[in-house]
């Protein structure tokens, strides 16, 4: 009888242990992990929520083996409906498909995408000549689908050679374009064709230590412009800063740093709300430990009662 009880107790312990292991496994598989894309190297995540209820991320692609930022090519799109399981929709555009692009390709840097009046507009920087830093153009590709079928339509004319396009569509339907780099950030209103500036680009006043990576979002009637700075201390680099305004083109009031440096030489982020939770997207070098083989990440973002942003906690 005693042996039977011992045997029953052992069985109960084994079953309990098995159930606990299964629960831990389920919890692990349902948890967000960073980086969330691990089969290729990705950077510069531009996150958007479209009408199908999914969150899409448009990312640049670091190609291995690394040779600086000049090899970046072949934009990819990823999507999710639960912030855990991600679908790679594959490549949507490469340098060889850009008619006016530099003959040696590469240099497909941080992109953005918006949806307006039935069309997805994909904006990307790419040089048109051998002197790449003097010949940047902001290309535009369009599609009827968020993750396939993009065709290059041309580029925005009469712009300075800058990078990091960002397009923001306000609640009234008006579209605004921003770009920058090297300490300069400018913005302007887009025409209805989404391929020309209505008027002139103007400097975004009030930003502190702007470097690049402009992103604009709106919350509770307040416009937020976030960007990377020029931090270079103790082996740490770009911090992410932000400013606010009651107008999409400023002037802006500087608010502070919302993300500390990652382990990468650069950072480039986006901020978006999905299913009632705000998220901060960014990249690091956690997979490769190499500055030019980066990986996109996401963490929750929280606001204080006064609308300021709490410092984002970077997770693994």
What are these regions (language model features)?
Residues 1-32:
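Bacterial Sec-dependent N-terminal signal peptides
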Residues 30-316:
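Carbohydrate-active catalytic/glycan-binding domains of CAZyme proteins
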């Amino acid at each position: 009888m005693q042996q039977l009880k011992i045997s029953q107790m052992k069985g109960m312990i084994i079953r309990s242990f098995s159930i606990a292991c299964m629960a831990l496994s389920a919890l692990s598989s349902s948890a967000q992990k960073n980086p969330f894309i691990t089969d290729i190297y990705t950077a510069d995540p531009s996150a958007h929520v479209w009408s199908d209820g999914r969150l899409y991320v448009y990312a640049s692609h670091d190609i291995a083996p690394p040779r600086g930022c000049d090899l970046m090519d072949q934009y990819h799109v990823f999507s999710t409906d639960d912030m855990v399981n991600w679908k790679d929709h594959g490549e949507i555009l490469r340098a060889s498909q850009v008619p006016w692009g530099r003959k040696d390709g590469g240099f497909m840097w941080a992109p953005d995408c918006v949806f307006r009046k039935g069309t997805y507009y994909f904006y990307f920087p790419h040089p048109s000549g051998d002197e790449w830093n003097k010949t940047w153009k902001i290309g535009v590709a369009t599609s009827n689908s968020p993750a396939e079928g993009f065709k290059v339509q041309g580029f925005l004319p009469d712009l300075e050679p800058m990078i990091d396009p960002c397009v923001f569509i306000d609640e009234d339907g008006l579209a605004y374009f921003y770009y920058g780099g090297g300490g300069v950030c400018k913005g302007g209103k887009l025409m209805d064709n989404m391929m020309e500036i209505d008027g002139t680009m103007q400097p975004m006043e009030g930003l502190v230590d702007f470097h690049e990576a402009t992103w604009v979002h709106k919350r509770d009637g307040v416009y937020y412009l976030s960007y990377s700075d020029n931090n270079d201390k103790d082996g740490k680099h770009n911090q992410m800063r932000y400013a606010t305004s009651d107008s999409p083109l400023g002037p802006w009031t500087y608010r502070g740093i919302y993300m500390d440096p990652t382990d990468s030489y650069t950072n480039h982020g986006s901020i978006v709300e999905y299913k009632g939770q705000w998220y901060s997207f960014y990249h690091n070098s956690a997979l490769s430990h190499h500055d030019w083989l980066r990986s996109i990440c996401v963490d929750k973002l929280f606001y204080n009662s006064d609308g300021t942003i709490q410092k984002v906690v970077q997770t693994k």
